[in-house]
Amino acid sequence: MSGARRGNGVRLRKGKLIPRDDGKRIEEFVGAATTSTDSASVARMLAPPGWSEPAQRPEFDEVVIVLTGELTIVVEGRRERISAGEVGLVPRGKRVVYRNDGQGACDYWSVCAPAFRPELAHMETPKPRVQENHVTIQVAHGQGRDFARLLTTWARAYLVQLELSGVELSLSLVDDRAIRRLNRTWRKKDKATDVLSFPAGDLPKGTPGPRPLGDVVISLDTAKRQAKEYGRTLESEMARYLAHGLLHLLGHDHERPRDAKRMAALEEQLLGERGMVADSLQVDAKARRARSLM
């Protein structure tokens, strides 16, 4: 068809194949009108299932002719489906997204007037896709099921606040007997405690799926006891344990003053109030003042 002249005075020339790394093949034909009309471009496109183009607000009118399959066009938030044999028109200046929501490939033609040029398409930069976080919980306490959903909700919220994505977090809600056994086995401390953290090892690069952070184990018995002792609600007490344990999984600790202040600030960010490390720092400060008065 290259160089062929039609009776209407439009010359079409065959364009080169334009490779795309999103799996969409474009064979482009550009026609320039020899009369007083604006130049136009004609492109044949094959869009695979699941394909989507970034939003754009073009300075040209575009006519879409679907040959096979189905094309979804979202114009100013309104979705239209163009099936085989149908034609769609997108006026210039409208925000539009093209995508293929069907099961098979969509073969269609696009006619733009004036001719398509990237600088006239005003294509938006797509936002990076945020990978979903996965939170699982095991309940090994007779009364723990009432709090399982609450802990899971908090955990997801904490991960978002910490700007983490594509990670997996495991939670366990146990009694004092179980957490004492874990504390004795892994920390050589034969007593119950409030929360334990077990970081996951590093996976080989390229391993598919979410990145595991590790396990946070919370004692519901200790939470009940300490909530009553310090005048806090049980929910508040467990939220403190969860925030504390999660930060330990991420490598934070409170051994040195500078690290403790950093961890205390992060706990307060997650909880909206003072956390376990801040309380510990306050106790230490009071002890130092008491010793100085002796």
Swiss-Prot record:
GO cellular component terms given for this protein: cytoplasm
EC numbers for this chain: 3.1.-.-
Domain Cupin type-2: 45-111
Binding sites annotated in the UniProt record for Zn(2+): H244, H248, H254
PROSITE patterns: UPF0054
Cofactor list: Zn(2+)
Principal cellular location given in the protein's record: cytoplasm
A biological process term (GO) from this entry: rRNA processing
InterPro entries for this protein: Cupin_2, MetalPrtase_cat_dom_sf_prd, RmlC-like_jellyroll, RmlC_Cupin_sf, YbeY, YbeY_CS
Keywords: Cytoplasm, Endonuclease, Hydrolase, Metal-binding, Nuclease, Ribosome biogenesis, rRNA processing, Zinc
Any one GO MF annotation of this record: metalloendopeptidase activity
Highest taxon of the lineage: Bacteria
Keyword rRNA-binding on entry: no
Annotated Pfam families: Cupin_2 (PF07883), YbeY (PF02130)
Family statement: Belongs to the endoribonuclease YbeY family.
NCBIfam families per record: rRNA maturation RNase YbeY (TIGR00043)
Name this protein carries in UniProt: Endoribonuclease YbeY
Organism: Myxococcus xanthus (strain DK1622)
Highest classification ranks of the organism: Bacteria, Pseudomonadati, Myxococcota, Myxococcia, Myxococcales
